[in-house]
Amino acid sequence: MDNFTKLSVAGSPDVTYTQKSGKPTVEVYTSDNIVDLLDIRVKDNTLYIGFKKNVSVSYNKLEVRVSAEKLNGIAVAGSGDVELKNGLKTDDIKISVAGSGDISGNNISCTDLDISIAGSGDINSSNITCNDLQVSVAGSGDMKLNNVTANFTRASVAGSGTAILSGSTQEAEYSVAGSGDLLASDFVAKKASASVAGSGDIKCHATDFLKVRTSGSGSVGYKGNPELDYPKKGLYKL
């Protein structure tokens, strides 16, 4: 197996990733007739896992176990799930779900983390340490990131989805467009800005300064005793 630093999963396979040194490995656990229908290959530093073209398949079990020294990208397109078995230590990484698949895994340590959902999938992770955190939920998916330590955080929700953050950050920028919710009342920021367009809600926690802008029926609730820059409506104390 050639070296790779990115993982791309298409369709319905479930993948577990283990970070370990040495040559990368890929193990497939399924029935023999399914193995021949899979398309697993490395191209442009990316391990692609999916099915061959024009294949319709049903199966009881399909698990792909992957190990590699480092990952800088994880992308799920479809209904497959990816689990980080023993955490992940890397520099910059982009994690994305498009469709109904899920990504889970704890203990992520990186420089910059860009993590996003487009569709109905979910992302769940705890114990994240990074410098720059970018969070995006577009669609009806849910993202839950617990015990995060970041320097700068930008989080946005567009649609009916939900993003839940806990932990701490020096500075945060929050935005909601649509009916979604951004719940960060347990995510302590020194400085924060919160913008709502539509009927969604933001709950946040700021210690030093909070800027709020709302349009529509949405609202912003806050914890802490920050200096406030806010309009006449749409802000309330938690």
Where does each model-flagged region fall?
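Acidic (Asp/Glu) and glycine-rich low-complexity loops/linkers
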Residues: M1-A98, S104-S116, N124-S136, N151-T153, ...
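Short, surface-exposed interaction patches in beta-rich subdomains
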Residues: S126-I128, D132-Q134, G141-L238
